C-alpha cells in the first residue's frame, strides 16, 4: 500500500532545532532537508536529520563550537560537517551548486551559494528536493509534494542530466520506488534505461548497497518486472533469466517471471516480514537454471544440479557486491537446499536442521522455517497443480515446531556426551580427532542409528 502525504506529522526534533537555532541566531539561514522532510510528510518514521545553511562550513564550525556543540569535518570539500547534539549526528551542508561529474559519481567542483533554491535544484528527485522550517513552512520549488501525493519518483530538472551526473541514482530511483510503493515517472523511467550503462563506472560495493536496499524493501518481485533492464546492469546474472522458457509441465512462466512471483509470494506468506536472507534467496534461488538447462528426447526441460550450482552463483554475486558473510552464507545455503526434500518426520527434521547448523551455526531453526517459506512460495509460483505442495509444507512446519519443542538433537551441544567423555572413553588425545568423533556421533543420533543416551554413546565409542 502506498503512503500519502498529509503535512509534516511532527516537529523537528529538539536536538536538530538546537543546531538550526544556533545558526539562525548568528544571522544565517538554515533549513531541514532531505529524507527527514519526505518521511515527515508521509507520516513515516524519521531518523537522521540533515540541515542546509547559508553559512560556510567554517562558520558552522565556529558558531556551533561557541555553543559547545562538537563538530566533525566529514566532507568539507563539499561543504559538509557533522554536528553531534545529545549524542545524535546532524549533517550540516553549505548551500552549493555542483560542476561536472567526470567520474559519474562525485562532482569535480562545488561552488557555495547563498540561495537555498539553487541548492535544492542539484538534488536527485523531487521528493528529496524539499526544505522545511518550523516557522517558514515547506519550501517546494519542484512540486515534490505533488509527486508524493501521486506516488511518483521524478528526477529534478532533466532526468538524463541527473543520472549522468551520478549513475548510482539509477538504482536509487528503483530503491525509492520499491520502498515507498511508488512508480517511476515516464520521462525519468526512459532516462533510467538509457543511463543504466553508467553503473559500469560505479564501485561494486555501492551497487551492492543499493541492490541490497531494493531486496530489503520486499518489492524485488515488482522491480524484476518493472525495472528489468536496470537490474540486469546491476546484477548481470539476471539477464539470462529474461524470457527463458523452462519447457516444463510444472512451470507456467519463464525463469524471470517465476522468480518475480516467488519474491512476491514470500512476502505474502510472511506478512511482509520476510528476513533479508529469505528475500535474497527468493531472488537468486533459480539463478543457475539457464546455465544448467538440458532437454530430453521429448523436448522437456531439466535443470539437473541447479540448486548446487545456484548456491555457488549466489555466493559469487553477493561477494562481488561486497555483501557481508553473515548474509551470504545463509542465502547460499537456502539456495542449495531449496529443492531439498523435507518430510514431516523427526529424522527429516533433524537432518535438515543439521545441514543448516553446519553451514550457519546458531541459525538453524530460523533458516529451516525460512526454507519452508521459500518452498511454499516456489510451489505456488509454478503450475496450479504444484500449489498443493504448499499445503503439504504446512504439515512439515507443524512437525518442525513439534520437533524443536521436544528438544531434538541437531547440534554438537545437544549430545549427551562431551569432548571429555570422548577422551576418557577412547583414550584419544585432545585435538581435532575429538571433534570428528563427536561429529560422527551427532550424525548417528540425527539419523536415528543411536539414541541420545550417554551410556549408549560411550559404549558405542568403546566398541569402535
Residue ranges and their predicted role:
Residues 1-464:
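Catalytic cores of the polymerase beta-like nucleotidyltransferase superfamily
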Amino acid at each position: 500500500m502506498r503512503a500519502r502525504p498529509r503535512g509534516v506529522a511532527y516537529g523537528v526534533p529538539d536536538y536538530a532545532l538546537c543546531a538550526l537555532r544556533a545558526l539562525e541566531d548568528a544571522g544565517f539561514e538554515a533549513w531541514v532537508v532531505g529524507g527527514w522532510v519526505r518521511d515527515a510528510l508521509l507520516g513515516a518514521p524519521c531518523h537522521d536529520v540533515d540541515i542546509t545553511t547559508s553559512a560556510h562550513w567554517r562558520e558552522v564550525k565556529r558558531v556551533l563550537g561557541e555553543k559547545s556543540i562538537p563538530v566533525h569535518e566529514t566532507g568539507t570539500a563539499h561543504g559538509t560537517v557533522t554536528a553531534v547534539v545529545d549524542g545524535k549526528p546532524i549533517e550540516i551542508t553549505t548551500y552549493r551548486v555542483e560542476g561536472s561529474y567526470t567520474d559519474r559519481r562525485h562532482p569535480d567542483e562545488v561552488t557555495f551559494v547563498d540561495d537555498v533554491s539553487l541548492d535544492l535544484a542539484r538534488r536527485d528527485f523531487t521528493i528529496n528536493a524539499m526544505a522545511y522550517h518550523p516557522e517558514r513552512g515547506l519550501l517546494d520549488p519542484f512540486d515534490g509534494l505533488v509527486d508524493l501525493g501521486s506516488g511518483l519518483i521524478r528526477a529534478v530538472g532533466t532526468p538524463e542530466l541527473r543520472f549522468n551526473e551520478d549513475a548510482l541514482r539509477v538504482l536509487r530511483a528503483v530503491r525509492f520506488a520499491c520502498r515507498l510503493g511508488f512508480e517511476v515517472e515516464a520521462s525519468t523511467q526512459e532516462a533510467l534505461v538509457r543511463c543504466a550503462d553508467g553503473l559500469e563506472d560505479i564501485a561494486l560495493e555501492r551497487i551492492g548497497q543499493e541492490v541490497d536496499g531494493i531486496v530489503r524493501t520486499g518489492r524485488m518481485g515488482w522491480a524484476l518486472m518493472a525495472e528489468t533492464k536496470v537490474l540486469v546492469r546491476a546484477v548481470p546474472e539476471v539477464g539470462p533469466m529474461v524470457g527463458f522458457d523452462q519447457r516444463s509441465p510444472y512451470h507456467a512462466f519463464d525463469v524471470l517471471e517465476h522468480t518475480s512471483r516467488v519474491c512476491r509470494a514470500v512476502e505474502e506468506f510472511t506478512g511482509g516480514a520476510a528476513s533479508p536472507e529469505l528475500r535474497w534467496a527468493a531472488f537468486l534461488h533459480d539463478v543457475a537454471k539457464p546455465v544448467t538447462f538440458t532437454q530430453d528426447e521429448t523436448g522437456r526441460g531439466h535443470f539437473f544440479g541447479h540448486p548446487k550450482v545456484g548456491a555457488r552463483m549466489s555466493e559469487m554475486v553477493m561477494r562481488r557486491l561486497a555483501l557481508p558473510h553473515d548474509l551470504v552464507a545463509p542465502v547460499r545455503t537456502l539456495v542449495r537446499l531449496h529443492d531439498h526434500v523435507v518430510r514431516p518426520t523427526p529424522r527429516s527434521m533433524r537432518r535438515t536442521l543439521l545441514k543448516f547448523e553446519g553451514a550457519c551455526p546458531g541459525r538453524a531453526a530460523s533458516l529451516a522455517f525460512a526454507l519452508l517459506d521459500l518452498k511454499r512460495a516456489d510451489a505456488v509460483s509454478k503450475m496450479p497443480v504444484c500449489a498443493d505442495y504448499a499445503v503439504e509444507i504446512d504439515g512439515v512446519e507443524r512437525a518442525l515446531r513439534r520437533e524443536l519443542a521436544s528438544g531434538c538433537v541437531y547440534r554438537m551441544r545437544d549430545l549427551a556426551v562431551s569432548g571429555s567423555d570422548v577422551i576418557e572413553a577412547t583414550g584419544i588425545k585432545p585435538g581435532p580427532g575429538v571433534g570428528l568423533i563427536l561429529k560422527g556421533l551427532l550424525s548417528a543420533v540425527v539419523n536415528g542409528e543411536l539414541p541420545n543416551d550417554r551410556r549408549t554413546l560411550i559404549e558405542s565409542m568403546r566398541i569402535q
